[in-house]
Each structure stands twice: as structure tokens, then as C-alpha cells.
Amino acid sequence: MSRVPSIPAAEAWARVQRGEARLLDLRTELERRRYGWPPGAQRVALAQHVVRPGGPDTIYLCQHANRSKLTGRRGASEVRDGWQGWLDAGLPVERT
């Protein structure tokens, strides 16, 4: 498995906003309910994306930037520092 490129949360959000990438949330539904999620981020199962990872337009987000490293093929990238990186960048969060 190749290394997953890690990008700052602000860059990930900018790419999503420009329509250049999609943000996939690898966290569990419990984590999303507890901590919130980025607007428009689709929750996906890790197992599905280890077998068939996304391409260069895919950015993965997980709680601590660990699970996303398992998807590192075909040019997908991850949000550096995971959910904490997202929060530290002051990016939008949705909650129920």
C-alpha cells in the first residue's frame, strides 16, 4: 500500500468548495453524532474503501488520521490531523 498524501484541513475544504474533490468521512456514526461532521461529507465504511479506494478527487477524514491511512491507493488523500485538524482550522461543523 502506498503512502497517503496528507493535506491541511483548510486546503481540503477549499477543494471541496471548488468542486474539485469529495470529502468522505470514515468515522463511525457514533463519532459523527458526538463530535459533528463537515457539511456535505458523506459517511462511508472503511472496509469498502480499503478494497476499492477513491481516486485523486477523494479526500478522507477520520477521527485521528489513522483509518484514512489504510486507503492510500490511487491518489486519494487525507485530512492532516483528522477531525482535530478540521476543528483547529475553524472549519464549519454540522450537528444534529
Identify the role of each PLM range.
Residues 1-22, 29-96:
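Rhodanese-like catalytic fold shared by cysteine-dependent sulfurtransferases
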